[in-house]
């Protein structure tokens, strides 16, 4: 699967640097 950032999107954004929201999961760029 895709490398995730270990975080879910909050208000469509991710707090982890260089991560992008693909709701509801944050993925590495």
UniProtKB/Swiss-Prot annotation:
This is a cyclic peptide. Disulfide bonds join 5-19, 9-21, 14-26. This is Cyclotide mech-2. One of its GO terms (biological process) is defense response. The keyword Transferase does not apply. PROSITE patterns: CYCLOTIDE (PS51052), CYCLOTIDE_MOEBIUS (PS60009). The lineage of its organism: Eukaryota, Viridiplantae, Streptophyta, Embryophyta, Tracheophyta. Keywords: Cytolysis, Disulfide bond, Knottin, Plant defense.
């Amino acid at each position: 699967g895709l490398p995730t950032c270990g975080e879910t999107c909050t208000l469509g954004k991710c707090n982890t640097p260089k991560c992008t929201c693909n709701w509801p999961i944050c993925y590495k760029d």
